[in-house]
Amino acid sequence: MSLRTTPRSPAEPGHLPVMLAEVLTALAPADGEVIVDGTFGGGGYTTAILKAANCTVLGIDRDLDAIVRAEKMAQANPRLVPLLGCFGDLDTLAEQAGHASVDGVVLDIGVSSFQIDQADRGFSFMKDGPLDMRMGGSGPSAADVVNTMSEKGLADVIFRLGEEKNSRRIARVLVQRRVQAPFETTADLAAVVEEAVGGRRGARSHPATLTFQAIRMYVNDELGELARGLRAAERILKPGGRLVVVTFHSLEDRLVKQWLRERAGAVPGGSRHMPLMSKGPAPAFELQENKAVQPSEKEVETNPRARSAKLRAAIRTNADAALDEASDGMNLPPLAELEKSR
């Protein structure tokens, strides 16, 4: 499951900010600046940013528990401004807080350790709890998805977001089982998925890992939120502003990589046989590195959850922000359809 290793409080054992040194280097906070931490979590990045410079941090999270932590931290450090909401709306949230532009944005994508560790949030099959998985607590839950979505819809979600090769078989078994009794707990779902794929057979990870990941990503529209967050950052960043994104899943990294390449002026379609007729719009970003930065071997030894992390960073130019609409490219059934059926 795409675990955001962090969330991220250096003060709490087991919650380590991933690639903290690399994030600070790419973000380069300076005195007097305004930085957006779009995924506040446990405040690990925010704490380090506030220590690195006499700046203001807008700590955004859609999880109310995270905002409660942020508000407690803000009592001791008024340079932190907690903002409840989705990072896909970070430009609107920043403007509502009185900041028409900002100097830096950092996004740490995925579910947090705090969320995983709370059984009642329903994110993990390691701790039995209600089948929920909602980061923000509103909208259709994982139980709604599993109990009402069509077999084809479930198979598509599990295959595209989980990259699970047994997606059709799993979807078929889930639909057959829910006729007898609806799914209500994480342990129940995990057991049925394990049975559907034939048990563990010595596998390093639980057979339900990819299915849980897919359903969680769908429930929270994580790729759509990421696409919206990137565009919001483009709109709110000043020229010279830094965008830093840490991902833990290949789908997330692919989306960030392709979007940054396009925004940095890499227009697809040209070749030496058929040159481009137009160079496209002026680049809105300059890449800090051509390739993703990965955690050091030492960090992975200390924090194994950091193993899959990739960091991509770019600097905003003075070009106008693009006006295209955000898309995750998955073409999955919209959550709104489930909302209507509830």
UniProtKB/Swiss-Prot annotation:
It is found in: Cytoplasm. GO terms for cellular component: cytoplasm. GO terms for biological process: rRNA base methylation. Pfam families: Methyltransf_5. Gene3D superfamilies: Putative methyltransferase TM0872, insert domain, Vaccinia Virus protein VP39. Its EC number is 2.1.1.199. Residues 322-342 are annotated as: Disordered. One of its GO terms (molecular function) is rRNA (cytosine-N4-)-methyltransferase activity. PANTHER family: 12S RRNA N4-METHYLCYTIDINE METHYLTRANSFERASE, S-ADENOSYL-METHYLTRANSFERASE MRAW. This is Ribosomal RNA small subunit methyltransferase H. It comes from Hyphomonas neptunium (strain ATCC 15444).
